Amino acid sequence: MLNQIGKKIFLDVNEKYYEYDLKDIFEFQLIKYYVGGNYNWHCDYGEAPVRGSVRKLSMSVHLPAPKEYEGGELNLINYSNYPIMVNNNLGSTIVFDSRIPHKVWPITWGTRIALVGWANGPKLR
């Protein structure tokens, strides 16, 4: 069921904003960040598990309430090359181009949980 919901979100956002050629290949992963946990600046675009396919869209769904941890802010670099902080309210979801650099700042207290996912397709031309 989670896979179907995530797939629908990807397809709806793609149709409205990106119009990428996506294949029926979607990956999802539950990530937990404990105190000190973080993820440095990176891009998700690149080889996907299926040969000849790349990650085109990325998604992050915020699962715990912000009061359950401190730190752990998700930041993205926008197209003007400025960092923006993503809303970390319970259930907040963001879908973005996998070529956009992003990071998660270190957790200073508690545990941050996120569902992340990727929509894949042929390499961009």
Name each model-derived stretch.
Residues 1-93, 99-125:
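Fe(II)/2-oxoglutarate oxygenase catalytic core
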